[in-house]
Amino acid sequence: MPNSTDNQGSAPPGLSSRPLPSSFDDNADFYNENGFQKVSRRLREEPLIPIGCIATVAAFTGAYRAMRRGDHEQVQRMFRARVAAQAFTVVAMVAGSWYYAADRQKQKELWKLKEQQDAEEKRQKWIRELEVRDAEDKALQERLEKRRKKKAERDSAAGAPDGVAAQAQAAYADAKEKVSSPAGDVAPEDPNKSNITGVRERLPTWLGGSKGADGSSRDKN
C-alpha cells in the first residue's frame, strides 16, 4: 500500500493540504474489508453501543415476562430500565460520533482516495496495454519492411546476370552480322584471279588451256 506522501501527491486539491492518518497507511486489511469485518471493527471501536442495545432488549424481555405473570411492579421497573438503556445507547452513539468524527472524516477521504487510485491504476494499465500493442505493431511493420527490402535485393541480384548475358548475346549477334555478308550479295572479284583465268583460256589444251563449251580447245595463233 502506498505511503501517505504518495497518497497526498495524487489526492485532489481539497484533500492534498490535509495530513492523512498514519495508522491506516500500512493496514491492508482496512482497505479490503467486507461487510462483516466492517461491522466487527465498528463494534470494537464503540463497544458501548452494543451494550446499550443488549440492555434495552433485556429490559423489554423482562417487562414482557412480568406482564405474563401479572407482576405490574416488575413491569414498571423493566419499562423504566428499558428507557434508561435506550437513553444510554443514544448517549453512547452521540459520544462515539463526536469522538470518532475526525477519524471517520479521514476514513471517508481515504475511501475516496482509494477509489481515485483504483481508477488511476486502471487508466495506467490501459495506457500500458496500448503502448505494448503499438510497440508490437511497429515491430511487425519493421519486420515486414525488412522482408520487402531483402526480397527486392534478391530479385535485383538474380536479374543482373540475365541482363549481362542478354547484352553479350546482342553484341555477339551484331558482330556476327557484320562479319557475314547478307544473302544475294556478290563478293568483289579479285583482279589477279581474273587475269590468270584469261591467260589459261588463251593457252592450247595440251599446254593446260581450258576447253570451250563444245569441248574444243581455244588455239589462237
Curated annotation (Swiss-Prot):
Main location: mitochondrion
Entry coiled-coil feature ranges: 112-151
The keyword Mitochondrion belongs to this UniProt entry's keyword annotation: yes
InterPro entries: Hypoxia_induced_domain, RCF1
Membrane topology: Multi-pass membrane protein
GO CC term, one of those recorded: mitochondrion
Record flagged with keyword Transmembrane: yes
GO biological process: mitochondrial respirasome assembly
One family name in Pfam for this protein: HIG_1_N
Transmembrane stretches, start-end: 46-68, 83-102
Composition-biased stretches (Low complexity): 9-23, 157-173
Superkingdom, natural source: Eukaryota
Disordered, as annotated region: 1-29, 144-221
Key words, A-Z: Coiled coil, Membrane, Mitochondrion, Transmembrane, Transmembrane helix
Residue ranges constituting the HIG1 domain according to the UniProt record: 20-111
Oligomer and partners: Associates with the respiratory chain complex III/complex IV supercomplex.
Recorded family membership: Belongs to the RCF1 family.
Task performed by this protein: Cytochrome c oxidase subunit which plays a role in assembly of respiratory supercomplexes.
Designated name of the protein: Respiratory supercomplex factor 1, mitochondrial
Species annotation: Neurospora crassa (strain ATCC 24698 / 74-OR23-1A / CBS 708.71 / DSM 1257 / FGSC 987)
Annotated gene: rcf1
